[in-house]
Structures are given as C-alpha cells and as structure tokens.
Swiss-Prot record:
Transcription listed as a keyword: no
Official protein name in the record: Contactin-1
Family recorded in the similarity comment: Belongs to the immunoglobulin superfamily. Contactin family.
UniProt keyword terms in alphabetical order: Cell adhesion, Cell membrane, Disulfide bond, Glycoprotein, GPI-anchor, Immunoglobulin domain, Lipoprotein, Membrane, Notch signaling pathway, Repeat, Signal
Glycan attachment sites: N208, N258, N338, N457, N473, N494, N521, N593, N935
GO cellular component terms listed in the entry, alphabetical order: glutamatergic synapse; myelin sheath; plasma membrane; postsynaptic membrane; presynaptic membrane; side of membrane; synapse
Further remarks about this protein from its record: F3 shares with L1, N-CAM, MAG, and other cell adhesion molecules from nervous tissue the L2/HNK-1 carbohydrate epitope.
Record organism: Mus musculus (Mouse)
Length: 1020
C-alpha cells in the first residue's frame, strides 16, 4: 500500500536586481564570502517526551538540547509558547540543557522546545512534553469473597487505581508474594483491564487472589486486597458452550508499532481459540501465544490493516468476535532540504516532500519563527534570504523537522580551484566535452576560442549553459589550444588547455553467440585495434553488469586470456543456468571505447513453476494449478507434486490424479491425503536434462475433516486397585485424528455378558481408562474394545481384548518377622512367606523413634525374596519395622511392629600412621591405637586394604595388632589404607603410599618427625 505524498517547494525571490561589491555583515539573513567557514546551528540532540515520577527522590529533571555551530550557539527555552524564566532559582542551564529543580506538576507540566542561534540564524527544536507520572495505591477496603460452582467460568475484577501513564502491566498473586498465577488455556490475565478470567473453575483454584499492578514508566508496583475464591463442589460438572468475554475493539495504531489483541472465552471444556485475518492471509510477523488468547503483530505495516477475527470453540458450541485494525503512519521524509549555497540573483528549487497517513501538512520556519504554510515561491535571491530554514511536516500523530542553512554567494569568476585540464585527449571520429567550471556568483556568461579564432555553435560544436564545450565527429584539424572565458557583473577570468587527437579504438574480433548444456565450457572471443600511445583494457559485462574478476567466486566460472595485449578472450567454465544471457566485451582506453555483444544459451533442467494455487480442498484431496516456468531450452516432460505436513520437515512426493502429470499440463489433484491435516504443496518440473528447482511453497492449508478410519492398537489393561477395571490402549497420533473434538469410546462387558457398556474419553492424548464399580468381583475376565471418534463421526473398533479386573489385596500378614542389626547404619529384616497366590511383592515400612509413623520409609522387594537390608540409618537410634504383602490392588495387613536399635557409630578418628619402614622384601606399617569416644562403638580390630595407586580394588587384611607387614610392590606405587573396625562399622581411613624405590615420602616425614624426633633414612 502506498502512502500519499505531500510536496512543497521553496523558491526565493530577490527585492533587488543588481549588486556591487559589498562588505560582510554579521546578522541574520546575510550572505557569505568565499572565504567564510562558519555555519549555523545543527541539532545533535533534541528534547524528548519525559515522564517525571511524582514520588521521585531525585528532585530534578533535565530536558536536553545540543547543537553544533560556528561560532558556538546561544540557547533559549520556551514552554507553552512562553519564555522560560531562567532568573528563577528552579531553572538552570547546563550547556543547552534545561534543568528543572523540584519539579512542580502545576507549574512545570507542559510543552517545551529549545532555540539555538548564532549570527547565521536560529533553529527551533522538536517539541517535547513534560508529564508527571503516578500510580495510586489500591483502596484499603477488604474485597468480598467470590463463590463459583466448579465447571463454571468466572472473572475477578482488578479495578486498578488512578494512574498516569496508561502503560500498566498486570499479574495476579495467589495466597502470598511472590507466587503469581501462570496463564494457560484455562486462565487468562487481560493486559487491557487487569481482570483475571478462568474458563471453568476447578477445586484447585481455591485460594486468595490479589491484583498486582506495575507501571514501568515510573518503576512502581501496587497490589490489591486479597479476594477469597471458593469453588463450590458439583457432583457432575455440566459442559457449556464457548462464550467470548475478553473482546478486542477497533483500534488505530501507528505503522512500525507492535499491536496486541486479546480474546478469551469461558466454557467447559476449555474452548480452543483460533485467529484469522478475514479474507486475507495473516501478517508474517504475527505470533499467537501458547494459550491462544493473545495475538501479537510485530512491526505492523499498512498492508496489515484489516478485519481480524477470533473464534472460540468446544464440543458444546462456538463463538466469534471481529474488529478492525486501522494502521496510520507518522510523517516520513521522501525528500527534505539540506544546507545549500546559491548564487545571488538566482532561483532556488528546494523540495520538501513527506509521506504519512493521514497526509501531513507542511509549514516553514525561518530563524525559528513562522514563515509560511504549504508551498513557498520566491525568485532572484538576495542576501536578505540567507538564514536558517526549517521545513516541518506534521499530521495528527506527530511532526518531523528538516533543518538547513541557506547561504547567498557573490564573487567574480575564478579558475583557481578548478582550472581547465592542460591536456585533453580525444579520439578521431569521436566526441569530446571540454569542461569549463569556474567559481562565480552570479552565474557568468561563457565564450570559447581556438587559438585566435572565436567559436560559435554549429552542427559539430556546442557551448553548453554550464560553459562546457562539446565537439562531435572529431577530425585531426580539431587539435589545438582552446580557451574558456567567463564573465559576470563582478569580473572576468579565463583558462586554457590543449586538445590532442588520437586513433580510435575498434573491435576487430567480436564475440559470437553460443549454445551449451549445463556443466559445459564456452569461449567468448574479443580483440581490438587502438592507438599505440595509449593503454588498452578489456571489460566484460553480463546482462549489463560488469564482471568483477577480483572476486574469489568469479574465478570459479570466469577466466580471461592475458597472453596478448589486444586480446580479451573470456572463458566460461562449468556453466550453470544463471550464466545464460548477453555478454558484452568493451575495449577501452582513457580516450574512448568500443563494444560488441553475444548471447550465451545454457540448456538445463526446468526452472521453478510459478503461480501455484490450491483449490477444491476436500478431506483426502486438493486440486492444484500452476503456471509453466522456464523450460531452459529443453521441453518439460513431467511435473511432480510434493507435500509437507505440519508434523514433518521433509517434502515427499504425493500421489496424484492423473498418476503421471505430463509436461503440457498445468493442473492436477493430490490424492490420498490425511483428513484434517495442515499441508504445504510445491511443484517440481522435469525434462531430459534433469529435475529443476521446486516452486515457491503454497500457503499452508488444512484438509477437511472426516471420521477416523484407524482403530487404536495394543488394547489391554488389567490390574489396578481393588474394584477397578483398568483399560489401556496406544493413543492414535495426531495424523489419525481426522477432525476436531477427537476422543475415544471405550466399550467393555463381562466375558460371558451380552450388553456392552460404553464410556467416552475426551482427552485425545490419553491411553488409559479406569472403571470403578464397588460390586465388581476381583479377577473377573472382561472383553474390551476401543474406537476413536471426532466431530465427523466414529471410527472402527479395535480387536476385542480379554483382561481381568483388579484382584483383591492380600489378606494375610507376614509372620515370624525378625531383624538383625548389622552396624550403626544397617539392619537386616527377614520374614516367613505368605502362602496366598496373589502376593506379588513385600513392602517393609520403617521409621525412627523420634519420627511419626506417617513419615515412614518404604522398601519394596519381589515375592520371591524373604529378607531385605535397610541402609543409611541413623546410629544409636530406635527404629520401628513392619512388613506387608502387596499386589497391584494394594498392600494387605502389616505384621506386628518390631522395635530395634542401631549400634553406636564407628570411630570418627582415623588411625595415625607413625612409621612405614622397608625391611627386606616387605614394608612394616605401624599406627597408633584408636580410642572410641563415648558415643562410638568400641574398636574390635583394624582392616587394611592393600591396593595399586589409582585403583579401588586390592587385598584386604584384618588384624587386632597396631602394625602389619605387606609385600614391596613390584611395579609402581601402592596405597595402604588403615581403618578401625567396630560393631558399628568401619571408621575413617588413613593411608600411606609405598613403592619399590627406597625413599621416604615427604608426607610420611611429617608424620614421623613429631613422634620420633629424628629422621629415619633407610637405604637398601
């Protein structure tokens, strides 16, 4: 969609027609000399809209303004079109910034702008609004409780307090801070009004709710009094149709902004929410939240304007809501004014073009003051027209400023900065333009001479308005000395150059047309004649674009022949379809050039078909039409239709009608599709040279729904809790749902029964149903079968399976339960097997004496085991233990409770190794005796582990002594671990490393020195 344009031109008219020499003055609106390097103010920072929190502790606010200028600018501020009184102590200036101390809403709220000026003029900044933000607390009154029947929908009102600005965010607390409600398909918090909506209330919703409101602009949050929500239990919750209660309104938004639409419905079951743009595709930047209740359109554009619809649906009915989005646009420059220098007495065309929606208006400022509205026309500029100009484009949604300085020039012609070239080359028979560009104001008159001959316009010679001289059909006689004369009312000047005639450049061997197949090579010849005094270069272009041989990717396919100076042959290697087109060879010198072209035809697989459209969408088929793509010079033999579903990223060939799509066809059907499935389609063309690129994929479509035709598999079940019949099956995957409101019908009857009992399971992802019946006989055989259904009908039943209802829990308790205390942390429990056949496992429950029985730990073992080990127990602690027999229906009665005590903890002190001495072929390791503490088990001996360093396994020794002899290691180092042993278990380890090398480790020295008082050094 194109936006309307507004065009405004500025043309300046002089009040005087002639001027003599002048003296430069420094006040607004005067011209400048050639040497003048100053310039008017250019804004680098301008004030922006600012919100000052009323409760801020900072005590000041700053509005920024900074301009670049020479000489430095002077700043001034205005508020609501009145001057800011800088003599007031509350106002101060820092550079160009305005600082307001102790801001007061009554005195300081308003619209501000900054003026920056120097002797070249004055400019005015964009306007900025200073506002005061606040968020009042919620009222202190208690909020009444809300009672709702389970299964019904409800809304809790937030009713936010007074505030500014309106950019609030809302969340809801549940019972305490910071536990926030998580939004899902059933619960929704509107960011428009803050209300909490629940599609249907459940017992788990019971609690106290508080609306939590945040203002990001002033970084403040408040929350309401808690609202008690009390769900009222219902024996059966009744379904009711979808009812949209959160509706979006017609909105006007700005192009480039993000737009949020909210739509939420009450209903039981929870309604599904779908979004669409009526009669048009959804914007590519649109995103739908996980719950479906929020549609966000990012960076909205004019083409996204239109009617949007949300639809809520459940098994009981649907509801729809529509509203329109209107997209407006801030003013935006198409072309704006820039700093300009013009000659005195000339006209100025200064375009100022803006676009926007609605159409912006144009107004002008000169030196900070209103100058004109709309188009401004003046002619024959004077010094009074110099100054700082601002073009302002504005509509209802904002304004934009374009600033520029206008300087008026007046000086006699001079060639000092841009003299004529001393030597100009031109080819015989060609054309030459000799430039003459002096600096002068006003624009001078031009005349030319060759030698002593004055030149006048003719069929071959033309003097341009800008002073340039054009000569056509050049001959040798045109060589010579040329002089350009420039004159205005302030003086005159001239400049001279020499024209030298060269031989022309000509193509003498032109490229010729070529026809090849993809992957082959082609050669384009090119040779030229040229003036030997000049250098010749060849330039190749492809379809009008110069080939850059310096690019690495170019070397793959293009190569030039550099063997001969006058030869520019081009080799095209491994040609691809993209290399087909027109190749042009240009032979050029600094004087002239000559070109010749030829066409390269590359035959290959077809290009992608275009214009793919989907029509006649049905449950298992769609009709496709497309337009023929390029055959790349080889006739198309057939087309292939490919599909991709939402469940896969892979494209697959589709079955079609007709099965073979001939190359002259542009329509066909894709058949054997999955009903109610989202598909994308594309078409691929094939010829004798291969298969081409696929078409652009179609828009995603959904096939019509149909009744399921696949039965659930793996139907079975059984087991479970007493008086239950558990039926299981493998849920059908999404591709077999075939329609909306998908679920299962479960049928079952006693094995010898006549009448099937049927129940409906609405959860499409479940594979389990449990039927409870207090009159059901345990371990009774049932026949069961399952079928799928959707809103289009029922599918076939599965094969009948035979399962048993849950058996009774065991009725006997294990007997002869006994325990054996193994250590401070382990107890062994044993019992006599229960003779009932229905026992599948045993459960041991145990708890410490200081704990409640409800906190008991459990250990489960199979029915073939008659003992179990309890580990990780507390030392020196009373424990209670009981054993029960269990099966899938539960556990039977427990045995009598056994009381026992764990032993005291093992010694906590490690043995202190006092020596490790080599004696012959053995090491003698000696340690101090470990004395147990009063709350530890008495030491009964020591365990020594002799193992290779880096390994965990080794040889274990036991002793009642305080030393042990171990063999000298043959290879590497060994570790000797020593620990005390007691009835409570093993104590803490001490260790020492030994090896076959006769040295004493530094770690061992630290052990020996304090106890022995001297260094023992042994050498064997």
């Amino acid at each position: 969609m194109k936006m309307p344009l507004l065009v405004s031109h500025l043309l300046l008219i002089s009040l005087t027609s002639c001027l003599g020499d002048f003296t430069w003055h420094r006040r607004y609106g005067h011209g400048v000399s050639e040497e003048d390097k100053g310039f008017g103010p250019i804004f680098e920072e301008q004030p922006i809209n600012t919100i000052y929190p009323e409760e801020s502790l900072e005590g000041k606010v700053s509005l920024n303004c900074r301009a670049r200028a020479s000489p430095f600018p002077v700043y001034k501020w205005r508020m609501n079109n009145g001057d800011v009184d800088l003599t007031n102590d509350r106002y101060s200036m820092v550079g160009g910034n305005l600082v307001i101390n102790n801001p007061d809403k009554q005195k300081d709220a308003g619209v501000y702008y900054c003026l920056a000026s120097n002797n070249y003029g004055m400019v005015r900044s964009t306007e900025a609004t200073l506002s005061f933000g606040y968020l009042d607390p919620f009222p202190p009154e208690e909020r009444p409780e809300v009672k709702v029947k389970e299964g019904k929908g409800m809304v809790l009102l937030c009713d936010p307090p007074y505030h500014f600005p309106d950019d609030l965010s809302y969340r809801w607390l549940l019972n305490e801070f910071p536990v926030f409600i998580t939004m899902d398909k059933r619960r929704f918090v509107s960011q428009t009004n803050g209300n909490l909506y629940i599609a249907n209330v459940e017992s788990s919703d019971r609690g106290n709710y508080s609306c939590f409101v945040s203002s990001p602009s002033i970084t403040k949050s408040v929350f309401s009094k808690f609202i008690p929500l009390i769900p009222i239990p219902e024996r059966t919750t009744k379904p009711y149709p979808a009812d949209i209660v959160v509706q979006f309104k017609d909105i006007y938004t700005m192009m480039g902004q993000n737009v949020t639409l909210e739509c939420f419905a009450l209903g039981n079951p929870v309604p599904d929410i779908r979004w669409r743009k009526v009669l048009e595709p959804m914007p590519s930047t649109a995103e739908i939240s996980t719950s479906g209740a929020v549609l966000k359109i990012f960076n909205i554009q004019l083409e996204d304007e239109g009617l949007y619809e949300c639809e809520a649906e459940n098994i009981r009915g649907k509801d729809k809501h529509q509203a329109r989005i209107y997209v407006q646009a801030f003013p935006e420059w198409v072309e704006h004014i820039n700093d300009t220098e013009v000659d005195i007495g000339s006209d100025l065309y200064w375009p100022c073009i803006a676009t926007g929606k609605p159409i912006p208006t144009i107004r002008w400022l000169k030196n900070g003051y209103s100058y004109h509205k709309g188009e401004l026309r003046l002619y024959d500029v004077t010094f009074e027209n110099a100054g700082m100009y601002q073009c302002i484009a504005e509509n209802a949604y904002g304004s934009i400023y374009a600033n520029a300085e206008l300087k008026i020039l007046a000086l006699a012609p001079t060639f000092e900065m841009n003299p004529m070239k001393k030597k100009i080359l031109a080819a015989k028979g060609g054309r030459v333009i000799i430039e003459c560009k002096p600096k002068a104001a006003p624009k001078p008159k031009f005349s030319w001479s060759k030698g002593t001959e004055w030149l006048v316009n003719s069929s071959r010679i033309l003097i341009w308005e800008d002073g340039s001289l054009e000569i056509n059909n050049i001959t040798r006689n045109d060589g010579g000395i040329y002089t350009c004369f420039a004159e205005n009312n302030r003086g005159k000047a001239n400049s001279t150059g020499t024209l030298v005639i060269t031989n022309p450049t000509r193509i003498i061997l032109a490229p010729i047309n070529a026809d090849i197949t993809v992957g082959e090579n082609a050669t384009m010849q090119c040779a030229a004649s040229f003036d030997p005094a000049l250098d010749l270069t060849f330039v190749w272009s492809f379809n009008g674009y110069v080939i850059d041989f310096n690019k690495e990717i170019t070397h793959i396919h293009y190569q030039r022949n550099f063997m001969l100076d006058a030869n520019g042959e081009l080799l095209i290697r491994n040609a691809q379809l993209k290399h087909a087109g027109r190749y042009t060879c240009t032979a050029q010198t600094i004087v002239d050039n000559s070109s010749a072209s030829a066409d390269l035809v590359v035959r290959g697989p077809p290009g992608p078909p275009g214009g793919l459209r989907i029509e006649d969408i049905r449950a298992t088929s769609v009709a496709l039409t497309w337009s023929r793509g390029s055959d790349n010079h080889s006739p198309i033999s057939k087309y292939t239709i490919q599909t991709k579903t939402i469940l896969s990223d892979d494209w697959k060939d589709a079955k079609t009608d007709p099965p073979i799509i001939e190359g002259n066809m542009e329509s066909a059907k894709a058949v054997d599709l999955i009903p109610w499935m989202e598909y994308e389609f594309r078409v691929v063309a094939t010829n004798t040279l291969g298969t081409g690129e696929p078409s652009i994929p179609s828009n995603r479509i959904k096939t019509d729904g149909a009744a399921p035709n696949v039965a659930p598999s793996d139907v079975g079940g059984g087991g479970g809790t007493n008086r239950e019949l558990t039926i299981t099956w493998a849920p059908l995957s999404r591709e077999y749902h075939y329609g909306n409101n998908f679920g299962y019908i479960v049928a079952f009857k006693p094995f010898d029964g006549e009448e099937w009992k049927k129940v409906t399971v609405t959860n499409p992802d479940t594979g389990r149903y449990v039927h409870k019946d207090e009159t059901m006989t345990p371990s009774t055989a049932f026949q069961v079968k399952v079928k799928a259904f959707n809103n289009k009908g029922d599918g076939p039943y599965s094969l009948v399976a035979v399962i048993n209802s849950a058996q009774d829990a065991p009725s006997e308790a294990p007997t002869e339960v006994g325990v054996k205390v193994l250590s401070s942390s382990e107890i062994s429990v044993h019992w006599k097997h229960v003779l009932e056949k229905i026992v599948e496992s045993y459960q041991i429950r145990y708890w410490a004496g200081h704990d409640k029985e409800a906190a008991a730990h459990r250990v489960q073992v199979t029915s073939q085991e008659y003992s179990a080990r309890l580990e990780n127990l507390l030392p020196d602690t009373q424990y209670f233990i009981e054993v029960g027999a269990c099966n899938s229906a539960g556990c039977g009665p427990s045995s009598d409770v056994i009381e026992t005590f764990t032993r005291k903890a093992p010694p906590s002190q490690p043995p202190r190794i006092i020596s490790s001495v080599r004696s012959g072929s053995r090491y003698i390791i000696t340690w101090d005796h470990v004395v147990a503490l009063s709350n530890e088990s008495t030491v009964t001996g020591y365990k020594i582990l002799y193992r290779p360093d880096g390994q965990h396994d080794g040889k274990l020794f036991s002793t009642h002594k305080h030393s042990i002899e171990v063999p000298i290691p043959r290879d590497g180092e060994y570790v000797v671990e020593v620990r005390a042993h007691s009835d409570g278990g093993d104590g803490v380890v001490s260790q020492v490393k030994i090896s076959g090398v006769s040295t004493l480790s530094s770690s061992l020295l630290s052990l020996l020195l304090p106890s022995l008082g001297f260094l023992v050094y042994s050498e064997f």
